[in-house]
């Protein structure tokens, strides 16, 4: 079912951004909340079936409108069950967000694929920033497509969790993981061809917009109670275009770092 989603109360546009509304659909429901620990490389017996389950997940993504073969292949390549607690491994390939501890979640597969496909459509970004690395899953998927991935996480416990997961999959040299304030971006590395933000603020931080390369794209959830994905493209030194996409539900975007 498709429905119109109004902009969230209190939302505002950064200078230079122009709105362009589109129809949206609800793609995420209530999020489960439970602590999570790093999963071992073999979560019970799931490893024996994970290839089959990943292929089923990819087929579902196709039916949900994901058509970029690079994204589908990347989703098929990364074992999502290794990024969640062993007790939740049997649910890893469901189209659901799952808790990873610290009141945070791993996004549902469709949302991960949708966000990556949006910033990669008709292009091949060379340098990408992920804001809100969480358990490291989305960074691992990005690393299958993008040559240079920078992922920033504000919560120390999740930073350590992501680092362990990326090391276990031998991706630590392909993803530069940073413990820091994602709202500030990484100005010393910018500009970025694409920025993927995995938490929702009332507005996109200006620091992130400024770190987009000319023609670069940023995708992020925006809003509080009512959220939707927004896709922003830098069109000039002080100008950005904006398009509203699907309605979603993400954890809040917060400033600062947490030890």
From Swiss-Prot:
EC? 2.1.1.77
- This protein's UniProt keywords: Cytoplasm, Methyltransferase, S-adenosyl-L-methionine, Transferase
List the Gene Ontology MF annotations in alphabetical order: protein-L-isoaspartate (D-aspartate) O-methyltransferase activity
- Which sites are catalytic? 107
Q: Where does it reside? A: Cytoplasm
InterPro entries named among the record's database cross-references: PCMT, SAM-dependent_MTases_sf
**Does the entry annotate any disulfide bonds, and if so which pairs?**
none
- The broad enzyme category this protein falls into is transferase
Q: Region Disordered: what ranges? A: 1-25
Reactions catalysed according to its record: [protein]-L-isoaspartate + S-adenosyl-L-methionine = [protein]-L-isoaspartate alpha-methyl ester + S-adenosyl-L-homocysteine
Gene Ontology biological-process annotations: methylation; protein modification process; protein repair
GO-annotated cellular components: cytoplasm
Asked if the Swiss-Prot or TrEMBL record annotates the protein with the keyword Methyltransferase, the reply is: yes
Keyword Chloroplast on entry: no
In terms of one coarse class, where is the protein primarily found?
Answer: cytoplasm
Briefly state the protein's biological role. Answer: Catalyzes the methyl esterification of L-isoaspartyl residues in peptides and proteins that result from spontaneous decomposition of normal L-aspartyl and L-asparaginyl residues. It plays a role in the repair and/or degradation of damaged proteins.
Assigned protein family: Belongs to the methyltransferase superfamily. L-isoaspartyl/D-aspartyl protein methyltransferase family.
- Name of this chain's protein: Protein-L-isoaspartate O-methyltransferase
């Amino acid at each position: 079912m498709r429905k119109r989603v109004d902009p969230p109360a209190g939302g505002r546009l950064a200078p230079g951004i122009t709105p362009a509304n589109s129809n949206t659909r609800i793609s995420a429901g209530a999020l489960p909340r439970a602590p999570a620990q790093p999963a071992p490389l073999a979560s019970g017996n799931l490893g024996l079936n994970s290839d089959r389950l990943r292929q089923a997940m990819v087929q579902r993504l196709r039916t949900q409108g994901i058509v970029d073969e690079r994204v589908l292949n990347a989703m098929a390549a990364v074992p999502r069950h290794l990024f969640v607690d062993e007790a939740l491994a049997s649910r890893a390939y469901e189209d659901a967000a799952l808790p990873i501890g610290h009141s945070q979640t791993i996004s549902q597969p469709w949302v991960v694929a949708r966000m990556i496909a949006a910033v990669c459509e008709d292009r091949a970004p060379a340098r990408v920033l992920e804001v809100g690395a969480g358990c490291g899953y989305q960074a691992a998927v990005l690393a299958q497509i993008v040559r240079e991935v920078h992922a920033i996480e504000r919560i120390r416990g999740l930073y350590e969790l992501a680092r362990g997961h990326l090391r276990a999959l031998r991706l630590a040299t392909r993803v530069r993981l940073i413990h820091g304030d994602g709202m500030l971006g990484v100005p010393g590395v910018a500009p970025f061809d694409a920025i993927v933000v995995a938490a929702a603020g009332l507005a996109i931080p200006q620091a992130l917009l400024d770190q987009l390369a000319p023609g670069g794209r940023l995708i992020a959830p925006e809003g509080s109670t009512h959220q939707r994905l927004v896709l922003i493209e830098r069109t000039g030194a002080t100008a950005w275009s904006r398009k509203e996409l699907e309605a979603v539900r993400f954890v809040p975007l917060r400033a600062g770092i947490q030890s």
